[in-house]
Amino acid sequence: LVPVALAEFDAVLGARPNQVDRLREEVDVAAAELLDVGVPGGEVTAEGVQMNVSVGLRYLESWLRGTGAVAIYNLMEDAATAEISRSQVWQWLRHGRIERDQVVAFEDAELAEAGEGRWDEARALFDEVALSEELDEFLTLPAYELID
């Protein structure tokens, strides 16, 4: 697939490494639009929040045990998926789409069903990267301090 992708990039970019020089004068975007996390016709659902909490916790718990790619709900997931999950939770909280209590309840339910492992550490880490006031650059950065 690399040759196919390169051909498409080359067709648009030519010899240029990027499109930084391509200004779109016809596009006028206000700051409020950049901050709007709404999706036309979409909504934040309890199922979506629960899934993000579950995936975030399950991935972090496995990562803390040294596994970087994890089967979660019959899909192979990695840090990028967990990053999306925790970022969505953080963003939904910041913009008032969900409540912290809802996230905590889903965490409680997830840990109630968990077996042995590093679940308490995973939860503390998820709270740090998803429930904090500031969004950390990447969820594994504070996690490195917890690796044996």
Predicted regions mapped to residue ranges:
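Non-catalytic helical/linker scaffolds that mediate oligomerization, partner binding
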Residues: L1-D148
